Design a protein with these regions (language model features):
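N-terminal secretory signal peptides that target proteins for export/translocation
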Residues: 1-3
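Eukaryotic scaffold repeat domains enriched in small/polar residues
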Residues: 5-171
């Protein structure tokens, strides 16, 4: 009888232990990703400090954007290696922004109230909260499906959210 109880309880305990190891952030991205090794993670973090601002910076040409389910609009722009992300509410009022220095292209995607910044040159996805903290990093795998996702979603000029269509246009 004791042996049966152990055989029954052991799988349950194993499931509980495994479920506790699941990352609490678990970035939701359309890419297939992997964990960065310690060296790549430290290298990326040392060269890509993200600063938060509550003052609306000067506007530059829009390079990317995304719209959250709650109606927040994140707009990315760049000038001479300096990148900026501006976050606006559904009425167009500036909420906060990020500034960082990265010598390559990037894309944006909302993940709940957090923002995923996709760094093209380094193949890194960084999950950033509204306070400018990097919560999680992932390496974007080099696959055909990921190449398609870059073009069809991340760099798309149009987004539809909650029945509204948002389009990025150059004048």
């Amino acid at each position: 009888m004791k042996r049966r109880r152990v055989i029954f309880i052991l799988p349950i305990i194993s499931l509980i232990v495994l479920s506790l190891n699941i990352c609490s952030f678990a970035m939701n991205t359309g890419f297939s990703t992997s964990e960065p090794d310690e060296k790549k993670q430290q290298y990326f973090l040392s060269g890509n400090a993200i600063s938060l601002t509550y003052e609306e910076p000067k506007k530059y040409i829009i390079s990317c954007f995304d719209v959250s389910e709650s109606g927040l609009v994140a707009v990315g722009s760049a000038t001479y290696g300096n990148q900026y992300i501006y976050v606006y509410d559904a009425t167009g009022k500036f909420q906060y922004g990020y500034a960082f220095n990265n010598p390559g292209s990037y894309g944006l995607q909302w993940d709940g109230s957090d923002l995923i910044i996709y760094f093209v040159r380094s193949d890194i996805a960084a999950l950033v909260d509204s306070a400018g903290n990097i919560k999680e990093l992932k390496v974007i795998d080099d696959t055909e499906a990921n190449n398609s996702y870059w073009n069809k979603y991340v760099f798309a000029k149009e987004r539809t959210q909650n029945g509204n269509t948002y389009t990025m246009k150059s004048n």
